[in-house]
């Protein structure tokens, strides 16, 4: 039952994508997963217009990942840097930076909660590639654009005994 429900959510999210990328809509807010998976450039090319808000919590998370030497952090920071060249959107950095305890408990959803709070305060559509974040935001009554990330195929190695 859960698996079917999950697939229905993904199909519905894709079907409604063109309705949610509305030129009349003013504010969009992104989470870390959308930045790392390089979805923003694609959305802008599909017609995303208006104000794109990048929470300071997302920037802090990307900086933290980059400082730890993780590729996702560097990828995310490069993507944000590239967004400055698009004239179709107005880029804005907003919201509180997370505290040490919020960073420590990021896996339990502390940073996601900061992003949802900012989306509520700015009346923004949340753009995410995290299914849990999307469902939580919908439960709070936020409008969400969920974009499924491509899964990397695992390389399989076979050893043959001769």
Predicted regions and their residues:
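Short glycine- and acidic-rich boundary segments immediately preceding or forming the N-terminal edge
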Residues: 1-16
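Active-site-proximal, substrate-binding regions of enzyme catalytic domains
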Residues: 15-127, 131-140, 145-146, 151
